Every structure is written in structure tokens, then in C-alpha cells.
């Protein structure tokens, strides 16, 4: 029994407080966290804890062990039935029962046969409280029969024909695993053309000449007995008619070859299954495997579809080059018609497979153990489902309930047994059996009626010590039936504790949330029920906290000096104190420079490595405090160092005492250059294996001039020597003479030996090969050996060339192997190698994580929990779990755009994880998958969850429009991320005086459905600052700010001597805002009407963006300004403002940088200079016409008329009154899109393709600039480039600017 107490807590009130102790509905009666002495007296019905599987296939070569274990009080006795009758084990000398359990051991290794003990076994565990029964265990010995002998004729067929090589393995138990190999035990390659069917046959859609071989061998592996049987080899010869001589070809017909299929190109036909339709039945939870293999030329490709729905994306697996469709964890919803389509260039054919999914019984609610007190009520519920629906039957103590002794306290209602007013005699074990034609479920659940007086399990006189101002928890673990009530008392004769300062937990623990000195004392716990009372005393002591009186301080010291840190601690005198010093949160270095003296840490001869954080940690048995300080080390004032140099290289190298594995090298040292030589470094070159590369051999003292060197066999050595002093290393000496050592067997084996599978059915053994230096002789090879770790198989070995891997085929999936790799050469073997463990290839996990739960922490964070998958289903190394999650749509349904899936991976065996960065008020979906080295397993069922509302973002924009004398109108766009349902807007504003001081703040609430609001009764000519933000139920969002000025009072600007009504005031106005742009700059000009003494400023930014305006102040009262550093080809927004005593005015425009200069159409038709210029143009044209007329009258040949017709001057074209060329601009006109050939495009730029002439044409390309006064630089210089023909096809009137340029 496992007692589960919910971790609730409740305040004590006056009077008794009932406390649960105990056994409420227990999931299992196997894990009871109670005192062992209590368990010795607690009566409990038996419960089966371990049993053999229902379908128990045994190895006939080993003893039979049929497991049955159970627990109960008193310990249960065991009995067995075989094939429905009592099995008397005493009459069979080969059968024994394991002591203390019901497990049967049948000794067939000494004598007897496994077949004798085939049958259906059932175990019964019984004590005075009832009887529990096991499942029906069907015992069958495994079988691995030999292949029947058969004579296989060679097969000869033409290239392009189809072929089926039958396997037909012997029927074994369990069925064998089939694979095809050659006589070298190498897997035969498979492809879309050649593949193995589910029945083991090898199918060729069409054969090729390279398919010719004499060793097509089918193997059957019986995993249970670890045996492999093989079929006789099949010989296949593929020929073509062209290869036959004319005589044979003339007398040979297609029917004399294997099969009847033509060798010519042909549409697909199915080799398996046959016909146009077939049926398939599968059980729920299994893997549904559907197969279609077709022949044809060219090779057909297989496609799959479900007629009445989509294939389940996360559970569908394609295998065998898509010839096999598998659906994992098949359910009733997967029933239906599946179609496979075979297609090649000559046609297509399809086959329909009708799938019906049935279901063995599975639990909806399995019955749970029930523990009751006398007189209580309870229920046992047994609910299962299946297809067909299972039948529910009840047994009590292993006997059908219909014939069991009657119990007046129980009532059977279908799948439920109702108990009322139970007594101790009502204790029993009930069995629920749910069965249909595909299987059964059997569950034991006991009803245990107990009557026990209260017992307190906490040891008496337990002493609790607690630091003051911290919580104190006093335990009172208890047990009893019926449920006892718990009371606490303080002092020998104190009354029950019921003040608010105490908290009583349901497990009996008394909590004092903030313990004080006066909490010290003796506390008594009392447990009562109708059968008795129990009490226990515990003691509480309150201790003073530990604290650091003097903390260490930050220090900066020079290298080589000393530093001291002080740490004074005060603590409760009754507790022992230990003070520990740490450096960078680690123990102090084991260096005598660090000394601890009482309250001080002293560091002598400080070095740079001593820099860091030093922490003083004061510990008592009850608490711990710490304080830290940083030490910084600086360099002392440097002093000049003497000049030294590295040694000269050694010379006169000589080899003596030349043996097989050693040689003596001697040399003469070079000059040490005023610094003694401390050592010599000897290097060698292997001229045979790695010429030109020098390797470290050894080092000797600087006083030596000879060295005895150890050598390896089969190496052509050269040596060189370098001298080292305090300055550095010398240049190498000249190389010595070469010395070749004799060959011998290897003295070491390869390293880094590993065994990992690249496919589910192989084992790739890799190692780091020996280099030439380590080979010790010619003919280096490796002996690779392997066997399964779990089993008694002999080692399998193979000798391979000097490579770094070997692939073992036909292995079971993810099985541990023992591996060893031994080196050998022509001289012999290396020592016996070490054995390492590897694993055969991994396969994708089969099972999805179950019981996925989502706990939404807040609007942007969720916690996901799941149950781990069974280790056997992982089929590989567990890498972790992966969560796919995505937002399907906003909860407010305002955002339905597709969101990409996000992935979070949690390493290892974690069963929970956090999803950060979620969007508030959104609808999310997730699933969980287990990951191994091969990849991901199937996804768990999708889980959906919603995030709560969050605070909104700032409103997207805020504009102040239509300023008047006493009002301003605000317009805004809602937040781009509302993160919930907007409840209202808040507007706060305050005036700003001339000294930039802020006035009183006004707070205003605005309904959420508004996007415009007018503020009235404001002060005239006053600047206001506005703060604006949105709100949801979660709170207020970020604010957006803006400033605006009400217009000036018109009466206030009249001259003092003019009465009202005599002189009309003129409102300040900015007009004709012009933006002339080049590639990276623009010239902004405008006209201003209004009072003098104003300050202008220019604001600009990228059009359409939400970035803030960039502001530039205009010096003086100029009406132009140059913007620099702009991005080419970019549309900009610009506005010009004027601020003065008369208030605030502004004007806006949009321009675009680029090769065409941007210019807004200027209203110059009413300008005097323009009218004069037009008159001069007209006069010159008139003079030109008169001259031409005179010359023509004189008989001249100048073709004026033809030239005029060919190049009509746009300046003499009539101007239409309705084209607005000389009219005033209206708001509507400014925003109308212009047609091709119009004066100005809609974005207010002059583009080359829209006008015959442009300012750029008369400037220096795109580099035309402007003077400070706004005039053009280089406007009239250079030649005009040739324009496209369509540029002169516009029939509309030219712009005044173009007219001026044409004239010039």
C-alpha cells in the first residue's frame, strides 16, 4: 500500500481538526511508506507482483521458469492449474516451486522434453483475506526447424524480364527474420528494382545482366534460439538475344526463358498482391503493414493513397523503397480502402486494399485496490473497450461471482460493484475479466476492511532546532482506521493550539511560519479515533542566526606583495561554527602562500593568477552566510633586464651502439650565449613512413652530451638536437646519419575501437589504424572479432586489410556486441586486444510519449510534462525528447496567418520542459517525440492550450491634426500587438510653458473602439505634451508620446492701434514645400507667410516606417535646407515646421532618392519671373518664324516645315485649361495618381520614363547638386542623353520646368 496525502494545509480553529492519514484509494498495495514494524501487524489480501507473459515462448534447451510472485499479510500460499485442472507439483520430480514465491522451475536440462510441458498455466496466491490469480500463461517451446531439402534448377532469363526468387522458410516459433545474402555473407543490394517482400521472397521488377550470379541465398534467423538456417543457393543467369549466335537465336523463343513476361518495355503489373483488390485485418495498437510490388520496364514507382481520407502524417512510414506502407499504432479510425499505384512511362495500374482494424480489450478504467474502515461504503469500477466490445465478468477470490458465497454488503451493477456498510468479513480479492475474440484483460483488486486504533509513527522526544524568524515544522506521522483526528498542545498542561500563527498540514505536521524565541518548548501531538488514542511529545529550540559583522573589502595590490582579507562572524554560542574561504567559488589553491589566521585570509607573494573573487562562508549546523570581495593584481614598475640570446645549435652528431631497439646518440654543444643550457631536445625523422616530418623523441639535461634512445622496429631513423636556455630554443642541428631497425610483430593494437550501426540491421566496427611508425613491419592487417554480449555465441572473426572499418550485416536492431580489433603483420600478431562494447544499428523509435500535459505558467511561458516511453521501444540511444509547437491562430481570431512550427529539444530522459517566448492571448498546439541516434519517433497526439491575455504594445501611431485656438484632434492606430481584448485607452496630457516646465497632468479614459478624439477648451498658443497607451484586462501597455501647439489667438496679433474688424489677421502658413533629391542628398525649400521672428526646423524619415522623425534645426530665417547622408533609391517623408510667438505650423511632403532628381511640381504659374520668361520665349519663337518665312520667300532650301514637323517644340503646344498647369494646387489634385507622360508622378518625383525632360538630363548625371540658396549646380551643363522613343509620345502639356529647360 502506498499512502498518499495531498499537500494541502489548513489553519487550525478552536476544537478538533480531523487529519487524513491514510490509505484512501491505493493505486497499488506494493509500496507502503510506513514503519516496517507497523507492516508486520497490518493484514492485507494477496496481490500478484510479478508473472510470466501471457504468450510465453521458452527455449527448449534451458530449464522452464514460470514466474508468479505475490505479496500479502499473512504471506500467501501458491497453487497452480494446468489446462484448467489442478497441477500437483509434488507428483512430478522435475517440477519445483521457488521458496517464498509461486515461481515454478521445471528441470528439463537433466531429463525430459519441453514439449511435455506445453499448456495453459494459471497461478493462485491465497491467504486468509482472499485469493489473487495470474493471467492464463500459455507455455510453448520455440522451434527452429531445418529447411526441407530441395533441388533448385538454375534460372536463365532475358534482360528486362521480371523474376521472383522464392524463399519459403520453415515455419518456426516465433516466425524467423528473413534476409538474402551471398556466399560471402554480404547482404544483396536492394533498390526500387530489386527488393524483398514481407513474405521473404526476392522480387525483380526487371533483371539486368549484372544480376547474374550463382549464390542467391535466403537466410532465416530464429532469434529465440539464436540460430540461422539457410536455403540452397539459387543460380540466376541473365542474357540478351543479341548475345546468342544467329543459330540459337533463330530457334529460341521467349517462352523457353524463365517466365512468360516480355523483355521489352511494358506497363506495370503487380507481382504481389494479386488481382485488383484484397483485404487486410489488423489489431488496434499494432503496426499495419501494406505491400505492393510491381514489375515492368522501365522500373515502376509505387505511390500510396487512402480513398476516404488522408494518411496519418505522424504515424506513416514508407519502407522498402515505398513498396511497403506502415502505419504505427493503428486505430479504428485507420480502417478504410488504401490504394497503391504502380506507374512507369508506359502506364499505371492500381490495387485497392480494404483494411479493417479490430481491437483486443483495453482498459478505460481498471479496478483499483480499496481499503475501507468498518461501516464505510466504496465501489470497484471495471471499464474496458474493444472491437467487438468486450464482455465484462467478475470473480471473487478466483471463483465466478455468480457461484461465490453471497456478501450482503456488495451489489453488482454491470461493470461496477457497489459496497455499503462493509465489515471485516467483506475483505476479498476481486478479479475483473474483459474479453472478446481477440484477447482478454484480467485485473485483481482487493477490498481490505481494517479496524485499527491510532498509532503515531514519529519517534518520541524528537528535538527540532530552528533559526529564529524561519519556519519550524514539527512532524506527527500517524496511522489508524477509522481516520483519526489530530490535535497539538504546547506545554505539559497547555490547551489545544488554535491561534492563527500555527498551520496544521494534512499529514499531521505542525508548522510555525515564523518561529520566535518564545516558540521554544515541548509540543504534544494527540491522535484519536473511536478505537483509541495515541500521543507523542517533541521539543523545539530556537537559535540565533549567524551573521558577518566585518565583511572582506575590495583590494588592489601590486604583483609580488601581500594582501589580507578580514571576515568577522557572530553566531549562536550553542552551535559549532566553521569558516571556509573560497576563490571564485572553489576551494583555495593548495599553496603555502595562502594562510588563514582566525578572522583573516592572507595571500603572500601575490601573482596575476591570484586575481578573482574571494568569499568567506560561515556555516553552522542550521544556517550559512557568506560575503565576497574582489582582488585585482597590477604590475609593479618594470626594471631593465639584461640582454641574452638563445644557444647556438649543437653539431657533430654521431650514432654508436646500434642495436635492434636502441642506439646511442652523442653531440657537441654550441655556444650558450651568456645563458646556461638547461636541456637538450632530441627529435627524429621517419624517412620510410613520414619523410620530412620531425617528431619529439626525448629530452636530457643540459649537462649531458649523449643519450640512449629507445627505437621502434621497421623505422628508418634520422636524429637532430636543439639546445634550450632561459631565453629560448636554438635552431636544430644538422641531421644525423640514417639508421634502419629490423621488423617485428606489432606491439600495440588499434585505438578508438567503436561499434555503431549505420542501419538497423548492421554493425559498423571502426578503429584508429596504426600509422606506419607503429606497424613494426610490412603487411599490416587487422583481425576483427565480434559476438553478442548477451549470449554464449562464439567469437566471429575476419582479417581485413589496412583499413579503418568493417561492416557486419544481418544483425538484430540495437543489440549490444562485444568487439575487439587486433593488429598483425608479416611477422606475427600484436598482444591480445581489449574488448569494447558497441551496439548494432539504431532504428526509429516506435512509441510516442504518452500523457502529455501542458501547464500554462503565464502569458508567455508554458510548462510541458509527458510520460517517458518504454526503453525497449526507443530502439537506440536516448538523445532526449523534442517538442514541436506552433500557434494556430490568435485567440481573438484577428491574426490567422500561418506560423512556422518551433522546436525545442530536451536532452536525456527529462520528462518536462518549459516553452518560453509564447505570444499572449494565443491558441497553441504541440506534440512531443522521443529522439534517438537514428531520428525522431512518432509524435504524441496534439495537445492544444491557450495563453492568457498580456499587456498590449504601444499604439502604432499617434498624430495631432486640425489644431485650432482651443482644441486639438488626436488620431491613432491601435497597437500592432494587442495581446488581448482592448478595454480602453488612457490619454494623459499637460501644458508646457516657454521655459519648458510641465503643467498639471490631465488623465482621460477613452473607449477602446475609438481611433480619434478631440480635446476642447485648451489654451491658445500653448504647447501640450501627450502620453497615450492602451489597456487590456492584464494591465496597461507601453505608451507613445507626442507634442502639439494650439494656434495663436487672432485677436492677439492685431496692432494695438487697430480695432477689431478693421484689419484681418493673417494666419502663418508654409506652402510650396519642394524636395529636389539626388542619390544621397536632397534640397528642401519652402515659402512662408506670417509673422516674422520664427524658427524653422526640418524633420524627415523613411516613408512607411515606424521609426521616429529625425530633426534638423534651420539656421536663421532661411527657407531652404540640405539633407545629406540619405540612402539611394529610398522614399522619404519630410515636413517643415515653424515655431514662434504666433504658434506652430508645418507642412509635409514625400520624395524619393535615386538617379532621377525628385522635385515636387511648383506652383510658379503666377510668379512674375516665370510670366516674363514665357513672354521672352514667345517673342523668340515669333522672331524665328519671321526669319524662316523671309528665307522661304527668298527661295531658300531650309526645310523649316519638315524640321518643325519632325521635332515639334513642346513649348509651342497649346496648354489646356483643365490640366492645372497654372492653377492652384488642391488637396485632391496632390493625391491623384498621374498617368504615363504626366508632369509629376504620384510620389512627387520627376522620373525619366514619365517626362520628356528632367532636371537630371541637364545636370551631371545623378551628381547634380544645389547651392545653399537652393539654386542648381550644373543644371545647364553637359549634353542631354538620347531618350527612348516613347519619351516624346506624350500629348499632354509640358511642365513649366521642362519648358524652361527646352528653351535653354
UniProtKB/Swiss-Prot annotation:
SUPFAM superfamilies: Fibronectin type III, Immunoglobulin. One of its GO terms (molecular function) is ankyrin binding. Residues 649-744, 746-843, 848-950, 954-1051, 1064-1156 form the Fibronectin type-III domain. It holds the Pfam family fn3. GO terms for biological process: angiogenesis; axon guidance; axonal fasciculation; axonogenesis; cell-cell adhesion; central nervous system development; clustering of voltage-gated sodium channels; neuron migration. The modification Phosphothreonine is found at residue 1221. The chain crosses the membrane at residues 1168-1190. PROSITE patterns: FN3, IG_LIKE, IG_MHC. The modification Phosphoserine is found at residues 1226, 1251, 1254, 1271, 1290-1291, 1295. Changing residue 469 to S: In NEDNMS; uncertain significance. The keyword Nucleus does not apply. Changing residue 913 to D: In NEDNMS; uncertain significance. Detected in all the examined tissues. In the brain it was detected in the amygdala, caudate nucleus, corpus callosum, hippocampus, hypothalamus, substantia nigra, subthalamic nucleus and thalamus. Disulfide bonds join 68-123, 167-218, 292-340, 382-432, 476-525, 567-616. Residues 1199-1304 are annotated as: Disordered. Keywords: Cell adhesion, Cell membrane, Cell projection, Disease variant, Disulfide bond, Glycoprotein, Immunoglobulin domain, Intellectual disability, Membrane, Phosphoprotein, Repeat, Secreted, Signal, Transmembrane, Transmembrane helix. Residues 1199-1219, 1241-1250 have a biased composition (Basic and acidic residues). Changing residue 1093 to P: In a breast cancer sample; somatic mutation. Residues 25-1167 are extracellular. CDD domains: FN3, Ig4_NrCAM, IgI_NrCAM. It is a single-pass type I membrane protein. Residues 1191-1304 are cytoplasmic. It is linked to Neurodevelopmental disorder with neuromuscular and skeletal abnormalities: An autosomal recessive disorder characterized by developmental delay apparent from infancy or early childhood, intellectual disability, hypotonia, peripheral neuropathy, and/or spasticity. Disease severity is highly variable. Most affected individuals have skeletal defects and dysmorphic facial features. Some may have ocular or auditory problems, behavioral abnormalities, and non-specific findings on brain imaging. Cell adhesion protein that is required for normal responses to cell-cell contacts in brain and in the peripheral nervous system. Plays a role in neurite outgrowth in response to contactin binding. Plays a role in mediating cell-cell contacts between Schwann cells and axons. Plays a role in the formation and maintenance of the nodes of Ranvier on myelinated axons. Nodes of Ranvier contain clustered sodium channels that are crucial for the saltatory propagation of action potentials along myelinated axons. During development, nodes of Ranvier are formed by the fusion of two heminodes. This is Neuronal cell adhesion molecule. It comes from Homo sapiens. The gene is NRCAM.
Amino acid at each position: 500500500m502506498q499512502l498518499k496525502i495531498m499537500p494541502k494545509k489548513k489553519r487550525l480553529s478552536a476544537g478538533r481538526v480531523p487529519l487524513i492519514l491514510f490509505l484512501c484509494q491505493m493505486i497499488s498495495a506494493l509500496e507502503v511508506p510506513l514503519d516496517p514494524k507497523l507492516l508486520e501487524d497490518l493484514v492485507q489480501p494477496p496481490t500478484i507482483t510479478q508473472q510470466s507473459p501471457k504468450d510465453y515462448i521458452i527455449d527448449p534447451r534451458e530449464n522452464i521458469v514460470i514466474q508468479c510472485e505475490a505479496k500479502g499479510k499473512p504471506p500467501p500460499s501458491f497453487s497452480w492449474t494446468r489446462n484448467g485442472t489442478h497441477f500437483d507439483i509434488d507428483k512430478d520430480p522435475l517440477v519445483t516451486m521457488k521458496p517464498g514465491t509461486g515461481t515454478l522451475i521445471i528441470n528439463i536440462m537433466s531429463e525430459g522434453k519441453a514439449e511435455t510441458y506445453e499448456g495453459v498455466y494459471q497461478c493462485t496466491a491465497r491467504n486468509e483475506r482472499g485469493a489473487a490469480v495470474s493471467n492464463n500463461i500459455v507455455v510453448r517451446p520455440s522451434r527452429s526447424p531445418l529447411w526441407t531439402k530441395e533441388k533448385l534448377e538454375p534460372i536463365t532469363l532475358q534482360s528486362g524480364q521480371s523474376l521472383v526468387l522464392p524463399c519459403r522458410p520453415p515455419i518456426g516459433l516465433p516466425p524467423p527474420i528473413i534476409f538474402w545474402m551471398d556466399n560471402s555473407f554480404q547482404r544483396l543490394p536492394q533498390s526500387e528494382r530489386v527488393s524483398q517482400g514481407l513474405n521473404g521472397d526476392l522480387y525483380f521488377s526487371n533483371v539486368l545482366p549484372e544480376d547474374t550470379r550463382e549464390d542467391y541465398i535466403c537466410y532465416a534467423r530464429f532469434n529465440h534460439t539464436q540460430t540461422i538456417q539457410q536455403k540452397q543457393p539459387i543460380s540466376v543467369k541473365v542474357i540478351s538475344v543479341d548475345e546468342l549466335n544467329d543459330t540459337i537465336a533463330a530457334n529460341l523463343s521467349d517462352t523457353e526463358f524463365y517466365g512468360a513476361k516480355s523483355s521489352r518495355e511494358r506497363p506495370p503489373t503487380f507481382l504481389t498482391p494479386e488481382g485488383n483488390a484484397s483485404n487486410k485485418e489488423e489489431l488496434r495498437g499494432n503496426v499495419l503493414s501494406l505491400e505492393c510490388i510491381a514489375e515492368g520496364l522501365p522500373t515502376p514507382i509505387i505511390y500510396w493513397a487512402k480513398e476516404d481520407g488522408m494518411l496519418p502524417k505522424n504515424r506513416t512510414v514508407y519502407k522498402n523503397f515505398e513498396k511497403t506502407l506502415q502505419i504505427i499504432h493503428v486505430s479504428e479510425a485507420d480502417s478504410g480502402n488504401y490504394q497503391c499505384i504502380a506507374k512507369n512511362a508506359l502506364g499505371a495500374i492500381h490495387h485497392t486494399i480494404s483494411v479493417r482494424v479490430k481491437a483486443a480489450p483495453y482498459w478505460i478504467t481498471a479496478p483499483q485496490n480499496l481499503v475501507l474502515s468498518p461501516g464505510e461504503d466504496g465501489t470497484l469500477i471495471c471499464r474496458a473497450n474493444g472491437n467487438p466490445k468486450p464482455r465484462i465478468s467478475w470473480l471473487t477470490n478466483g471463483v465466478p461471482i455468480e457461484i461465490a458465497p453471497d456478501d450482503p454488503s456488495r451489489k453488482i451493477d454491470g461493470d461496477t460493484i457497489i459496497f455499503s456498510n462493509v465489515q471485516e468479513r467483506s475483505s476479498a480479492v476481486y478479479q475483473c475479466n474483459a474479453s472478446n475474440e481477440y484477447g482478454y484483460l484480467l485485473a485483481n483488486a482487493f477490498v481490505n476492511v481494517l479496524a485499527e486504533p491510532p498509532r503515531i509513527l514519529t519517534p518520541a522526544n524528537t528535538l527540532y532546532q530552528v533559526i529564529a524568524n524561519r519556519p519550524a515544522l514539527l512532524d506527527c506521522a500517524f496511522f489508524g482506521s477509522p481516520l483519526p483526528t489530530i490535535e497539538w498542545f504546547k506545554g505539559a498542561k497547555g490547551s489545544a493550539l488554535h491561534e492563527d500563527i500555527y498551520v496544521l498540514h494534512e499529514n499531521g505536521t505542525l508548522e510555525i511560519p515564523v518561529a520566535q524565541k518564545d516558540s521554544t518548548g515541548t509540543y504534544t501531538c494527540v491522535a484519536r479515533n473511536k478505537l483509541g488514542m495515541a500521543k507523542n511529545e517533541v521539543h523545539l529550540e530556537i537559535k540565533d542566526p549567524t551573521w558577518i559583522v566585518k565583511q572582506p573589502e575590495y583590494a588592489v595590490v601590486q604583483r609580488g606583495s601581500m594582501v589580507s582579507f578580514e571576515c568577522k562572524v557572530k553566531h549562536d554560542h550553542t552551535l559549532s561554527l566553521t569558516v571556509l574561504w573560497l576563490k571564485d567559488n572553489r576551494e583555495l589553491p593548495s599553496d603555502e602562500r595562502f594562510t588563514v589566521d582566525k578572522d583573516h585570509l592572507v595571500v603572500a607573494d601575490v601573482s596575476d593568477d591570484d586575481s578573482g573573487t574571494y568569499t568567506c562562508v560561515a556555516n553552522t549546523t542550521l544556517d550559512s552566510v557568506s560575503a565576497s570581495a574582489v582582488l585585482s593584481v597590477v604590475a609593479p614598475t618594470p626594471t631593465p633586464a639584461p640582454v641574452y640570446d638563445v644557444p647556438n645549435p649543437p653539431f657533430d652528431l654521431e650514432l654508436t651502439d646500434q642495436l635492434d631497439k636502441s642506439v646511442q646518440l652523442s653531440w657537441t654543444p654550441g655556444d650558450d650565449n651568456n645563458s646556461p643550457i638547461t636541456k637538450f631536445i632530441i627529435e627524429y625523422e621517419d624517412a620510410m613512413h613520414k619523410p620530412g616530418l620531425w617528431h619529439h623523441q626525448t629530452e636530457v639535461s643540459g649537462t649531458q652530451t649523449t643519450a640512449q634512445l629507445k627505437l621502434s622496429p621497421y623505422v628508418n631513423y634520422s636524429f637532430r638536437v636543439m639546445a634550450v636556455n632561459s631565453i629560448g630554443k636554438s635552431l636544430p642541428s644538422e641531421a644525423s646519419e640514417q639508421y634502419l631497425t629490423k621488423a617485428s610483430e606489432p606491439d600495440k593494437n588499434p585505438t578508438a575501437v567503436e561499434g555503431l550501426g549505420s542501419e538497423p540491421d548492421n554493425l559498423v566496427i571502426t578503429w584508429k589504424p596504426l600509422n606506419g611508425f607503429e606497424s613494426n613491419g610490412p603487411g599490416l592487417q587487422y583481425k576483427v572479432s565480434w559476438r553478442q554480449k548477451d549470449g554464449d555465441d562464439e567469437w566471429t572473426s575476419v582479417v581485413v586489410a589496412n583499413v579503418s572499418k568493417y561492416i557486419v550485416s544481418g544483425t538484430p536492431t540495437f543489440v549490444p556486441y562485444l568487439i575487439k580489433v587486433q593488429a598483425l603483420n608479416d611477422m606475427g600478431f600484436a598482444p591480445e586486444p581489449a574488448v569494447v562494447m558497441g551496439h548494432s544499428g539504431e532504428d526509429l523509435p516506435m512509441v510516442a510519449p504518452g500523457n502529455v500535459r501542458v501547464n500554462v505558467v503565464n502569458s508567455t511561458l508554458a510548462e510541458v510534462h509527458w510520460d517517458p516511453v518504454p526503453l525497449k521501444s526507443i530502439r537506440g540511444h536516448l538523445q532526449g525528447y523534442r517538442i514541436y509547437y506552433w500557434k494556430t491562430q490568435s485567440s481573438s481570431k484577428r491574426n490567422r496567418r500561418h506560423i512556422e512550427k518551433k522546436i525545442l529539444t530536451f536532452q536525456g530522459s527529462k520528462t518536462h520542459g518549459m516553452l518560453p517566448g509564447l505570444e499572449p492571448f494565443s491558441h497553441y498546439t504541440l506534440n512531443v517525440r522521443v529522439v534517438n541516434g537514428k531520428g525522431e519517433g512518432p509524435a504524441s497526439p496534439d495537445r492544444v492550450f491557450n495563453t492568457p491575455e498580456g499587456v498590449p504594445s504601444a499604439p502604432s501611431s499617434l498624430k495631432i491634426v486640425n489644431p485650432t485656438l482651443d482644441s486639438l484632434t488626436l488620431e491613432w492606430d491601435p497597437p500592432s500587438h494587442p495581446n488581448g481584448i482592448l478595454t480602453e485607452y488612457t490619454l494623459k496630457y499637460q501644458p508646457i510653458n516657454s521655459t519648458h516646465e510641465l503643467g498639471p497632468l490631465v488623465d482621460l479614459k477613452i473607449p477602446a473602439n475609438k481611433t480619434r478624439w478631440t480635446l476642447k477648451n485648451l489654451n491658445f498658443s500653448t504647447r501640450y505634451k501627450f502620453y497615450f497607451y492602451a489597456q487590456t484586462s492584464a494591465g496597461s501597455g507601453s505608451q507613445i508620446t507626442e507634442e502639439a501647439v494650439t494656434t495663436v489667438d487672432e485677436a492677439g496679433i492685431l496692432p494695438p492701434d487697430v480695432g477689431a474688424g478693421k484689419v484681418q489677421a493673417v494666419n502663418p502658413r508654409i506652402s510650396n514645400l519642394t524636395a529636389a533629391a539626388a542619390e544621397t542628398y536632397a534640397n528642401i525649400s519652402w515659402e512662408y507667410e506670417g509673422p516674422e521672428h520664427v524658427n524653422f526646423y526640418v524633420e524627415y524619415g523613411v516613408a512607411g516606417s515606424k521609426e521616429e522623425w529625425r530633426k534638423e534645426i534651420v539656421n536663421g530665417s532661411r527657407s531652404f535646407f540640405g539633407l545629406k547622408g540619405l540612402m539611394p533609391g529610398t522614399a522619404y517623408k519630410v515636413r517643415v515646421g515653424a515655431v514662434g510667438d504666433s504658434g506652430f505650423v508645418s507642412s509635409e511632403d514625400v520624395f524619393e532618392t535615386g538617379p532621377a532628381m525628385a522635385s515636387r511640381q511648383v506652383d510658379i504659374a503666377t510668379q512674375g519671373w516665370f510670366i516674363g520668361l514665357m513672354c521672352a520665349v514667345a517673342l523668340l519663337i515669333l522672331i524665328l518664324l519671321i526669319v524662316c518665312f523671309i528665307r522661304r520667300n527668298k527661295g531658300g532650301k531650309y526645310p523649316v516645315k519638315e524640321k518643325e514637323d519632325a521635332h515639334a517644340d513642346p513649348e509651342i503646344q497649346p496648354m489646356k485649361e483643365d490640366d492645372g498647369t497654372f492653377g492652384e494646387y488642391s488637396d485632391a489634385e496632390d493625391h491623384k495618381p498621374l498617368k504615363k507622360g504626366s508632369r509629376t508622378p504620384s510620389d512627387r518625383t520627376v522620373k525619366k520614363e514619365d517626362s520628356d525632360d528632367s532636371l537630371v538630363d541637364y545636370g551631371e548625371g545623378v551628381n547634380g547638386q544645389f547651392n545653399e540658396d537652393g539654386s542648381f549646380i550644373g543644371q545647364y551643363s553637359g549634353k542631354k542623353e538620347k531618350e527612348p522613343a516613347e519619351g516624346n509620345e506624350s500629348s499632354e502639356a509640358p511642365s513649366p520646368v521642362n519648358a524652361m529647360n527646352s528653351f535653354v
